[in-house]
Structure formats: structure tokens, C-alpha cells
Design a protein with these regions (language model features):
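All-alpha prenyltransferase/terpene-synthase fold signal
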Residues: 1-315
Length: 315
């Protein structure tokens, strides 16, 4: 799918231009910053693994990346995040208004592009997905500064706000190839499990010394009052003193550096990171098993490698 992938990278840049110069300036900056483009790649691999022979997958892979980027622009404003992939965020450079408007532009351009495919199933899939992403982010916002969040709720949130777009990317590959329902469901499960593992690893990296090396702002989730899996584990399994520290820190709008570092040390000295990594490993095992419904081919093998890459970012 190398040629397909390059076609998507080209289209991502060309279709993001606008007669509004500020929009073009920001989108050009966004799409030359790098990024793994895992979601578009997943869609391409799943379509080809299902023996799809058309070119609508190029358009839909572009749509997936636009939706993903739009959510990042909006999320960074909501979270007041100043770094993404090790560089200043759009709202830090151009202001909240510009970042929000460019996010809106990318959403609308995504829907313009998907109408070119002319498939109501595709439209319905994207409509459901964008709704789910918004609900997941709202759920996370509601539970900010809440130390009592359960693992079940944590998983619900990350499946909605992160894993859903992976699920859609994989599922669309089967829809384009007009696969039977069983194969479509299998690929959707594959995407959902990969996306869940991807977010768990991302949450581990917030407390890892490796986080900064891949462009993450260390302890950003903790500073924003977000309870993710490593912190959740420590809160449930830690000492009374550690629980008090977590409660105080999470419920404080501006925690001190000493509080943040004390929690990071406690997490690194506990079993929290191995516990979270083990859960991510299980998600990847389930993702790979879900691909058993496909006959062996090079794109299926590549999809398995993509799943393992999501896990191995920590290594």
C-alpha cells in the first residue's frame, strides 16, 4: 500500500487549502509536522486486505485524518495544552479562535470529501463516529478532577474518544470492499482493540521518562486533572498516604511540581505501569485474533504489524 499511502499524504495537504489564507497557513503547518498517520494507514491496509480494488479508500483515509486533526485542534483548546508532538499547539501560536475555526473547517471539508464516495453506509458510519468522539470528550471533561473514576468508566471514555476512530478506519475498509457482516464486524473489533491499546500506551507515556522523547509533555494528563489507568491503579492499590496525595493533586486546579513529581515517582515504583501495559497487550492480542476471519495476505500481515507497533511505542 506504499503508493496508496503516498497518495493519501498528497491529498491530505492539497485538499486542506482554503481561500482563507489563515486556514491554509495553519493546515500547511499541521500537515508538515509529521505524525504517524496510523488511522489512514489502517483504513488502507484493511481495504486492501479485503481485496478492494477501487480508489475511494484514498479519499476516506484523508477524511479520517481530517477528523482526527480537527479533534486534536479542539481538544488542545479545551485542555489548554501548549505542546503537541513536541511543538507548540495551534491555539498557542494563532489563538483559540483560529484553532477552533480551522478544526471546524477540517470537519466540514471531511464531510465534503466523503460525499464524493456516494455511499450512505459510509456517511452513517462517519456520522455515528463523530458523535461518539464528541460524547467521549464530554465524558472526559465531566470526570476531570474526579479521583473516584472506575476502570470501567475509564475504558468507556477512551473507547469513545480515541478507539472509535480506529474502529471506523478498519470497518470502512470492509464496507468499501462490500464484505459480509462477519468480516466487517471482525475488522471493527480489530480497530477498536488497537485504538484502546494505543490510548493506554499514551497514558503510560505521561508517567514514563520516555514520554518527552516522542513529543509528549510529561505529566500533562495529571496537571489537567485527568485520571488515567496508571493513576487509577495507584489510587486503588496504593497506601492511604498515596491516596490522599492523589486526591489532593487531582482536585487542585494548579498542582505543585512537588505533588506531580511525588505521584510520578510513586507510579514508577508501583506495579501501575506493568499493570497498564499488560492490559494494552491483551487488547492487541484480541485485535490480532479478530483478523483471523481474513485469509492470509500481505496487507493482513501488515495490519498485524501495525497493531504491534501501537504497543511497542513504549519500548
Amino acid at each position: 500500500v506504499r503508493a496508496d499511502f503516498h497518495a493519501v499524504l498528497t491529498q491530505i495537504k492539497t485538499q486542506a487549502s482554503s481561500k482563507a489564507r489563515l486556514v491554509t497557513t495553519i493546515t500547511e503547518d499541521l500537515f508538515t509536522q509529521g505524525g504517524k498517520r496510523l488511522r489512514p494507514l489502517m483504513l488502507l491496509l484493511c481495504a486492501r486486505a479485503c481485496a478492494y480494488r477501487g480508489d475511494a479508500h484514498i479519499v476516506l483515509a484523508t477524511v479520517i485524518e481530517y477528523i482526527h486533526t480537527a479533534t486534536l485542534l479542539h481538544d488542545d483548546v479545551v485542555d489548554n495544552s501548549h505542546l503537541r508532538r513536541g511543538k507548540p499547539t495551534a491555539h498557542t501560536r494563532w489563538g483559540n479562535e483560529a484553532a477552533i475555526l480551522v478544526g471546524d473547517f477540517l470537519y466540514s471539508r471531511a464531510f465534503q470529501l466523503m460525499t464524493q464516495v456516494g455511499d450512505t453506509r459510509v456517511m452513517q458510519c462517519f456520522a455515528d463516529t463523530t458523535n461518539c468522539l464528541a460524547e467521549g470528550e464530554a465524558q472526559q471533561l465531566l470526570n476531570r478532577h474526579n479521583p473516584e473514576i472506575s476502570q470501567s468508566l475509564y475504558l468507556d471514555i477512551i473507547r469513545s474518544k480515541t478507539a472509535k476512530l480506529f474502529e471506523t478506519a478498519a470497518q470502512l475498509g470492509a464496507i468499501l470492499a462490500d464484505m459480509p457482516q462477519a468480516i466487517e464486524a471482525g475488522l471493527a473489533r480489530y480497530g477498536l482493540h488497537v485504538g484502546t491499546a494505543f490510548q493506554i500506551i499514551d497514558d503510560i507515556l505521561d508517567y514514563s521518562d520516555d514520554g518527552a522523547s516522542i513529543g509528549k509533555n510529561p505529566l500533562q494528563d495529571l496537571q489537567e486533572g485527568k485520571v488515567t489507568l496508571p493513576l487509577l491503579y495507584l489510587y486503588e492499590q496504593g497506601s492511604p498516604a498515596e491516596k490522599r496525595l492523589i486526591r489532593t493533586t487531582i482536585m487542585t486546579e494548579m498542582p505543585s511540581e512537588s505533588q506531580l513529581n511525588a505521584i510520578k515517582t510513586a507510579i514508577q515504583e508501583s506495579h501501575a505501569i506493568p499493570y497498564a501495559y499488560n492490559l494494552a497487550e491483551k487488547e492487541i492480542e484480541q485485535a490480532i485474533s479478530a483478523l483471523d476471519i481474513l485469509s492470509d495476505n500481505p496487507c493482513k500481515t501488515a495490519a498485524i504489524h501495525l497493531a504491534r507497533f501501537a504497543l511497542n511505542r513504549l519500548q
